[in-house]
Amino acid sequence: NANSDVMHGGFQDNGNFITFSPNPTSHWNMPFNGDGCFAGIADNEEDFYLTIQRGVMYKMKLDTNAERLAFNRMDPISADSTNYMFINPMVMDDNADIIYWAEGHKFWRNNDLANIQYNNSHAKSDLGWHLFSDSLPSSSMKISVIETSVNPANVVYLGTQNKYIYRI
């Protein structure tokens, strides 16, 4: 939501922080500690997606003080976490509540975020995750960045540690 006052981000070595205020000097709150990484906010501005080191991802329901009301771990159980980067790439699509996820040279998508129920579990889950069958051409390549296009929609860019960029 371009008109929203909500800001959410991962601060490496310093957790994940959120503010609900447009005031640049307002206090930011930390709902989850760890090496804060990538973050996303659902269109409803009630569901927050955050990652910490080694590919751990959570969906959280927060109050306006960024206190956890409910959570659910959601990184895919079928992914081999030994292929993750320390700060593992994740992005939320700019046009829809869809998350894209990297597993080394493999590429994942979850377009069923609304159906991930809160159960206050720290267990990984495959709910809604789909592995692209035609990920990168070589297993020696690693996806290091993922970005989506606003216009045109439905375009995803992958960058690799080998200095290649792919458009999907």
Outline where the language-model segments fall.
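Beta-propeller blade termini and top-face loops
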Residues: 1-168
